[in-house]
């Protein structure tokens, strides 16, 4: 998806992005939406557009969560996903020979086996993600951080404290 995903024209509502079902979406436009980015299943890749990347707004939450069939979501809309566990991948892909950083809001893992992955663009390039906080990891969820393709890049949480986080019987893998 190379075009811009933006909030509505009046600015009264935040637009959110929801990746559902198997398969892969790639975002590489300069998006201005300020709602959450939700991955129910499959892979959502964001491809750096500059050294300081702006694919997703800095305050946008990244959330792994699947609402099961026959349930209503937080937006009161009936979902259409098969009755299964969630689980998805969020991948940041850097540019060749550039030090790429994407800054985001909170990271939440609420359902399924999930992975946050870094992939450098090649050459001397690196890929790094900066999240505001690791907000929630529920006990029926696992969260894997795969830095192996980041060419020395990092995943950083700038405001993480255990006092303001909902970390149940978490399973976190690096």
Describe each PLM feature range:
Residues 27, 38-113:
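Extracellular beta-solenoid/beta-roll
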Residues 1-58, 112-174:
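Extracellular repeat-rich scaffold modules on cell surfaces
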């Amino acid at each position: 998806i190379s075009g811009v995903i933006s909030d509505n024209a009046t600015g009264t509502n935040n637009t959110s992005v929801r990746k559902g079902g198997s398969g892969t979406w790639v975002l590489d436009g300069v998006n201005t939406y300020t709602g959450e980015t939700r991955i129910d299943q499959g892979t959502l890749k964001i491809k750096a557009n500059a050294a300081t990347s702006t694919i997703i707004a800095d305050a946008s939450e990244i959330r792994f969560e699947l609402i099961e069939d026959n349930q209503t979501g937080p937006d009161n809309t009936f979902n259409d996903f098969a009755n299964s566990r969630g689980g998805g991948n969020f991948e940041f892909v850097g540019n060749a020979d550039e030090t790429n950083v994407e800054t985001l809001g909170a990271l939440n893992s609420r359902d399924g086996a999930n992975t946050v992955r870094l992939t450098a663009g090649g050459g001397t390039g690196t890929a790094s993600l900066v999240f505001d906080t690791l907000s929630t990891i529920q006990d029926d969820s696992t969260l894997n951080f795969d830095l192996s393709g980041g060419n020395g890049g990092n995943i950083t949480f700038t405001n993480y404290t255990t006092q303001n986080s909902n970390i149940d019987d978490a399973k976190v893998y690096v």
